[in-house]
Structures are given as C-alpha cells and as structure tokens.
From Swiss-Prot:
Domain GT92, first and last residues per copy: 151-439
Protein's name in the database: Glycosyltransferase family 92 protein F13G3.3
Transmembrane regions: 10-30
Keywords for the protein's UniProt record, in alphabetical order: Glycosyltransferase, Membrane, Transferase, Transmembrane, Transmembrane helix
A GO term from the CC aspect: membrane
Keyword Transferase: yes
Compartments where located: Membrane
GO MF entry, a single one: glycosyltransferase activity
Length: 501
C-alpha cells in the first residue's frame, strides 16, 4: 500500500505540468515588444503619464504636409528623452498603418516639471480611427479634422479663470470685431452672467468659446502628485498652440494676447491690412512681436451705464513696457510658447513708433456718470513719440460704441448685464496671490525661489458666486508599459457655486 503522501506529490506535479503547458500555449499569442522598448533605463519611471489636450488631422497643410496628424499634450519634460516618439496607428476604410511621431518641445524652459509638447506624423489618408501605442497595446485617441473656413485674423485669448472683468471683455469683443478679427477664448471658469453674454456673442460670430479643462490623471491621487501645480500658467503654451493648430489652414495671422491686451491698427483700416503690410515688407519672418505699453483706463462699474466709448477716450499711457506678444504667420510656424516659439524662427520686433499693444494694465472703476470726454486718446508710448495721429479715431470710436449699443439692447444680453459683478473680488484675490508666489520673485530676478507659476496655488474658495466651470469626460489608461495616456472628451461648461482655478 502506497503512503498517503505519494498521491499529494503526484497532484502537485500534474498541476505544474498543466500550468507549464498552458503558459507555453499562451506565449504563442502574446506579442513580445521590440528590444528598444525593453531599455531598463526607460522603465525606471515608466509608464510615463501623458495628458492629451487635442489632436488635429490635416488633409492638406502648407507647413506640416498632406495627411498629417498633430497631437498636443503635456507631460514630464523627461518624456522627451525617455520616450522620444509616439507610435501611432491610423485606420481608414481601406487600410491601416503604423507611423512614428517624434516628440517636439513647445515650452522653452524646464522651470516647471510638466511642459507642453507635440507629436507630428503623416498617417493614412482620411483616418476614421487614431490609436497610440502604450508599449504593449493601443489606446484610441479622439481627433478633429481642421476647418478651412476662412478667418483672416484670429485673436487667441489665454485661458481665463475666475474671469469677472467684464469691462475688458466687452471692449475686446467690439474692438476686435470692428477691425476684422475673430476672438477665440479658452475658459477654465467664469462668472455666470459673463458666459451667458458670451454665448450670444458667439452666436453673432464675434467669438468662439472653448472649455479649457484642468489635467486629471485617473490613475493618480492628486494628493500624491498634482500635475496642475506643475504646468506653467494653466498650460498657457498648450492653449496657444491649440489655437494655432486649430486655425492653421484657415487664417493668415494668429495673434496671442491676454484679455487686457488691445491691438489697435495704426497704419491700416484693419488687422489684415496692417499685418499683410508687415509680411510683405519682411517676407522671410515667421512671426511679429508687438511690445506692450501699459495704460490706465477709467470705466463705470455698473453695466447699465457702461460705455466702451468712455473707456477708449480715457486711455492714458504710463510710459512703462512689458514683455510683448506675438502674431504668428501660421503657414510658417507649428507651435509656440507664451511669448515666442521654441524653434529659432525669424521674427520681426515691431517698433513702438509703428504700433504696440495697448495694455489695459490699471482700471479705475467709477461709481457714477462723469462729464463726457470727447477727445481722441493719444498714442504716447514709452519711446516719447509725439504723434499727432491718435490711438484710435473718433470715427472708429463711434462705430464701436454703436455696435456695443446694438448688442447690449438685445434682450438675450440685457437681462444678464444687470447681474455682472460690481466688485472685482476674484481679481483682487488672484492679484495678491500672484504677487506673493510669482511677481515678487520675477521682478527681483530671484527665480530660484519661485515655484512653478500658475493659479492652482491660489485659494479663491471663500468667495461664492455662480460660475460656469469647464468639465469633460476623462479617460485614462492604466496598463501601459511605456506610457499611459489621459484625455477629456465632450468638454462643456457646468454651473458651480464658485469659480475654480
């Protein structure tokens, strides 16, 4: 009679034999990655997280080439060295093909851990599906086919957060419209009546509104790592590049400005003519930079008596300048940082004698009506230029005011004007926060003590008012070997008790 232990040993042997057989069979169906994906150095921190803002397909493009795909993203700057390329799979009705898209830096520095970058490649014609390799499997990525509807000049506004300065918004909407530009606004959060008014302006063709979502990595707890604290100014470079890519084949010129910046054409009747003049005089440049001249303005704090004409006539130059902004020729440039692109492209620094940005730096809010000022505002930049030609003519001021009156009398606008804020509480909170966390170091040239600048470090939660905030359906992969991708779909706005940064 066999000892009782023998059957137990036989069972174990049979079990391991079965598992070995199953493993051998399964290995026949598992793809083994190429050796370059097995580099141990890569995997010290892999998989890397990459947040994709947008992807654009170009059937035809002057600078990118035909049938090109550009993916705009943000990630740890080490990804540029550790990953280097994204492997893309494009699929259309008749074929599929893999292609390698080289990562390209957009942000010009490493002051913040996460930076903007792009990946560009030629893919199959008219793709219906785009997938990115995770180093072992693939994940589908949503993309847009770029529009070719002509918009000669586009003003891309840097992402708004806790936006409440409706005075600057209304001035910009009408000034840009009258001189032939289309506004494209990125919005993180905005007080409720401002968005309601903006929706009417969007329907009238003044502007396009785009929710600008914060980064959300579903595979990470923000208490362990918050990428939003590690991107520069709510990933402003990515927003500007998104705008450039969006209008790349439909616009002649794309300008990148803040909401308190105004470009008023001086040598022509509209933006397109002024920019075309510069481009024809300097045919080799890829972009222009206009310096920023700080000004002081006055505005009525209550919308029922607000007048754009009053604001424009009371612009006073302060003879102080700030770092300027750029106007890109999109057929010659594919991405950009906040003030200039990463690549060494040829630029034209426009002299203030020709024109500059009117920076509405300081605003004095008035309680009641004052005596009417009929003077044309002077153009008096820091160069001390004594120019008889005003900043803006009486004729154009009257046209702008007439256009504002037409819009403000619409019932869909008027019912929200009365609800616009009087006290700029959010603006004060953010201004104080920025002074402490950024500008104090920047002005003293002590950048070594400065954290990555951005509104995420500002606490505005104590001020409660109805706000619209950007939202979306977030998706994250968790099983990537080399990278994990994250993105948001169906971006929209949702009402919230308080604005968010």
């Amino acid at each position: 009679m066999l000892p009782r232990i023998i059957p137990s040993v036989l069972s174990v042997v049979l079990l391991f034999s079965f598992l070995f057989f199953v493993t051998a069979v399964l290995l026949q169906f598992i793809r083994i990655d190429s050796p370059d994906l097995e580099n141990e150095e890569v995997f010290h921190s892999a998989p890397y997280d990459i947040f994709i803002y947008s992807a654009f397909y170009y059937n035809k493009s002057k600078s990118l080439g035909d049938s090109s795909m550009v993916i705009l993203m943000t990630a740890d700057f080490e990804v540029l060295e550790k990953v280097k390329n994204l492997e893309l799979l494009g699929i259309n009705d008749t074929s599929r093909a893999m292609t390698s898209a080289e990562l390209e830096r957009v942000t010009i520095h490493d002051a913040c851990k996460w930076i903007a970058m792009t990946a560009t490649a030629k893919i199959v014609l008219n793709p219906s599906l785009l997938l990115v390799s995770l180093g072992g499997n693939h994940a589908p990525i949503p993309f847009e086919v770029v529009s070719s509807e002509p918009k000669p000049v586009v003003m891309c506004i840097s992402p708004l957060f806790a936006a409440e300065n409706w005075h600057n918004l209304l001035v910009s909407l009408h000034v840009y419209k009258i001189f032939g530009a289309h506004m494209h606004l990125y919005i993180r959060s905005i007080v409720s009546p401002m968005l309601e008014i903006l929706r009417v302006y969007e329907q009238e063709g003044y502007a396009t509104l785009k929710p600008w979502n914060r980064i959300n990595l579903l595979n990470r707890d923000e208490q362990d790592f918050n990428p939003n604290l590690n991107v520069e100014f709510r990933s402003q470079a990515a927003a500007q590049t998104d705008c450039l890519l969006r209008y790349k084949e439909s616009s002649e010129f794309v300008a990148f400005v803040d909401l308190d910046d105004l470009i008023i054409p001086r040598v022509a009747d509209n933006y397109a003519s002024e920019f075309r003049y510069l481009a024809s005089e300097h045919p080799t440049v890829a972009y222009f930079t206009y310096s920023k001249e700080n000004t002081r303005i006055k505005a009525y704090k209550r919308a029922n008596v607000f007048s754009i004409e009053h604001v424009l006539r009371n612009i006073k130059h302060e003879q102080q300048t700030e770092t300027g902004k750029m106007i890109a020729i999109p057929s010659k440039i594919n991405n950009t940082w906040i003030h200039w692109p990463q690549k060494n492209l040829k630029k034209l620094a426009v002299k203030p004698e020709f024109n500059s940005i009117t920076h509405l730096k300081h605003i004095e809010l008035l309680d009641g009506l004052k005596s009417k000022n009929e003077e044309e505002p002077k153009y008096n930049p820091s160069t001390g230029l004594d120019n008889d030609k005003p900043l803006i003519s009486n004729k154009n001021i009257k046209m702008i005011e007439k256009d504002f009156n037409r819009m403000s009398w619409k019932s869909s606008v008027r019912r929200h004007l009365r609800n616009l804020p009087i006290n700029m509480t959010y603006s004060k909170l953010i201004s104080d926060c920025y002074k402490q966390s950024y500008y104090a170091f920047h002005s003293a040239n002590e950048n070594h003590g400065m954290l990555c600048p951005g509104p995420e470090r500002c606490d505005i939660s104590n001020h409660k008012t109805r706000c619209w905030i950007s939202v979306g359906e977030y998706h994250s992969t968790r099983d990537g070997k080399l990278i994990n991708v994250h993105f948001a779909e169906n971006a929209d706005f949702a009402l919230n008790d308080g604005c968010q940064v």
